[in-house]
Amino acid sequence: EKKMIATTRMFGSPVSELRDIKEAVATYTSRAAEKLRRQYGAASMISVFVVPKEERKPGQSFRHGPSVSSAITLPHATCVTSELIKPALQMAEKAYHKSISEHKTQLFKKAGVMLSGIVPDTTLQGNLFIPASGNNARMLMDAMDNINFSMRNDILKFASTGMERNWKMRQELRSPRYTSRWDELREVK
């Protein structure tokens, strides 16, 4: 059982728009929440980071700029994607503006989400002042996970994850996934 779940990816090309970073963070949060539910856990803390692209000087090898992160402790542990996306998007915006003010850059190469403070979802402690999402939200998430697993990934997704995804990783050189994708299986004629 994992104590922390992270989903991070490089962008296909450097990103400058806050909207693209928010879409990426929402997508990564959704993916991390799926992993969290697979291990029957709930997270009480979420961290978001962005990595600005640094200009390369002649003769210098490529490197990332220093990452800018933001973290928050949630009012109660949860594995419900919608309850994780909202604070993640707020932190993404905060990290974006902080990076621009500190590093004077508007190009970003990478973003990520980390869920920590993971506890079993059977032993969740409630909060007297915050209404619990209840079992219905968990059942909805399980139904979404089952549909996405049986049909294909991302057939059902949250609108905040975006539709076009221009920031998505390039995968032209990826090896075919013969053992896990029917549509990539070779045909003999």
What are these regions (language model features)?
Residues 65-189:
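Acidic, metal-coordinating catalytic segment for phosphate/diphosphate chemistry
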Residues 1-105:
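DNA-contacting surface of Y-family translesion DNA polymerases
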